[in-house]
Amino acid sequence: MKALAFVLAVFFAGSAAGPVEAASTPTVAYAKGYARYTLGATQYACLDAIATRESHWNPLSHNRTSGAHGVGQALPWTKMRRFGPDAWHNPVTQVKWMTAYVHARYGSACNAWAFWQQHGWY
């Protein structure tokens, strides 16, 4: 049953209303599905709002001024290495870091999103 829920989460990772857009790469779609499955729909929506504004879910998004990198714009990006050696380019590894970060710093993705809305960063 958990496997079916995970497959459905991956399929519907693009939004609560429908399947992933065709432009999404399978790896990004998997990262979104992983996040949704791990966090649940409500917390995923908050994480999605942050990731969309920070990087548009682009795992190679890089801020040349600050050095922030990836889906969640980790600063420094090397923070993500403890979640996998492929942290520079793998959105799943980046989402694992991002979910751990928002939980450790804000308690939840929705608390992080509320902070982002007030400050324009998290």
Region locations from a protein language model:
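N-terminal prepro-regions of secreted/extracellular proteins
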Residues: 1-26
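Peptidoglycan cell-wall recognition and remodeling modules
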Residues: 25-122
